[in-house]
């Protein structure tokens, strides 16, 4: 397996498929998953001739179960360590959910200053801010995130089964075809990681205000989200992101869930390709 060691000694696992001379696409996973969540997209774009790269966030999957740094700044720095190690340039960065926040922070702090990023995609992503606050009155009440923390602490294994079997993929909706394999794969990825990293990561994805990150992105950015996202409400995510981005394009998918990359990859993947090749 391939790893890069960060400046603070964390080993970050990554996948790197395809020709080293091909244009790179970098994928950023959501909470509490791993690079494996992008396997469908990685195979699709590998077949289109791209170089595809994805890493496990610190404390997640095969990366070091470190006790520190479970915040967007460290997430972005870890991504930069992988990108610099592989010397990726002219890259497209695609982030899902928490990974979208990671993409925004990476681009602003590293990708743009180093001239390494060409385009970005935010899929069902958490910016600008999830939690309700005085400056964000329509956000999600803190009690919701406290409930996630409580579920994780009480019985992480069962909580992850229930989360994947319910809102994440919209499997709780009537007449929805449920895939036990998809549920099991979500659970498998989640249980690979550190409970501490996942617990502390809730604060990172819910309480990090990234409005300024979005305003500072200077590359073309595609915003994609389903209007039946039960995890990250699209009215407080995609519809706000597009207002803050300088060069944004918005695509809303009627009836699609938070995990639409998996449930509707046959639609999402060609849309991603069209944006990348435009």
Predicted regions and their residues:
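Conserved alpha/beta-hydrolase "nucleophile elbow" surrounding the catalytic nucleophile
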Residues: 29-31, 91, 95-100
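Short beta-strand/loop motif that positions the catalytic acidic residue
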Residues: 217, 223-225, 229
């Amino acid at each position: 397996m391939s790893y890069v060691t960060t400046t603070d000694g964390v080993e970050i696992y990554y996948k790197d498929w395809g020709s080293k001379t091909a244009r790179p696409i970098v994928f950023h996973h959501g909470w509490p998953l791993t690079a494996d969540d992008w396997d469908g997209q990685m195979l699709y774009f590998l077949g289109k001739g791209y170089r595809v790269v994805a890493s496990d966030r610190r404390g997640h999957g095969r990366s070091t179960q470190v006790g520190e740094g479970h915040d967007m700044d460290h997430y972005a720095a870890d991504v930069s360590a992988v990108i610099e190690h592989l010397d990726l340039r002219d890259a497209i960065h695609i982030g899902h959910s928490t990974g979208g926040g990671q993409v925004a922070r990476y681009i602003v702090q590293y990708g743009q200053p180093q001239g390494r990023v060409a385009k970005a995609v935010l899929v069902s992503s958490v910016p600008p801010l999830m939690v309700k606050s005085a400056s964000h009155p329509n956000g999600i009440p803190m009690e919701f995130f406290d409930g996630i923390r409580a579920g994780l602490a009480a019985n992480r294994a069962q909580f992850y089964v229930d989360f994947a079997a319910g809102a994440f993929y919209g499997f709780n909706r009537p007449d929805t075809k449920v895939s036990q394999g998809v549920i099991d794969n979500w659970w498998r990825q989640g249980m690979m990681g550190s409970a501490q990293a996942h617990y502390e990561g809730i604060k990172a994805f819910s309480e990090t205000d990234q409005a300024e990150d979005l305003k500072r992105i200077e590359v073309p950015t595609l915003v994609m989200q389903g209007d039946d996202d039960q995890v990250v409400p699209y009215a407080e995510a995609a519809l706000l992101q597009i207002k803050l981005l300088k060069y944004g394009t918005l695509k809303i998918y009627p009836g699609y869930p938070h995990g639409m990359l998996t449930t509707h990859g046959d639609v999402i993947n060609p849309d991603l390709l069209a944006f990348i090749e435009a």
